[in-house]
């Protein structure tokens, strides 16, 4: 369980998050939604310990600030929305997922190498292992970065809009990989901007608007929540049409 209590974040005196209190159960799939500038990415970074905050973040009942680097790596893996594209091969990048567990020399053990191979296989990256990262398409690179996160072998995976810049086919492939990880027991917490996609893949949602948590709960409950319309000027409804891409659709409000 990841627990947040009274989380506040400010940048230059301007509040980005205001008194956010919520929790993310072990083994859940949660999407964080909200309008641009609502605080979604800031919340994810605070949970990962990458943004200064006031309040308390607890992971497995332990204050995040009290966890060692290795203990934190066992609990949380974080994939930001924007990443560099270093001039290295795919195997090396995936191996970086093991670095938080290693000593100063960053020498991989047999267990580390096995986890790297398993992560590549699981994410469909095994055929890419010998290729340079800069040679890959956007969808291939995103799978490789996800493989790096999987190789870290953390209990919870935090992802900031992982489907950004991907075409529909690669989005669906990525979501299928995340669902596979979720079924295997990983906790998935994902920032998403596509409402039908978020409502369709998540078991629970958190709505941030203006840095404030305005609603939370399962998709069918949030469909009717007035905070959704206030945030987006639109609402979400179940979509049972057989040719629909997702189980929910966005509808305009009068």
Language-model regions: role of each:
Residues 192-193:
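H-loop/switch region of ABC-family ATPase nucleotide-binding domains
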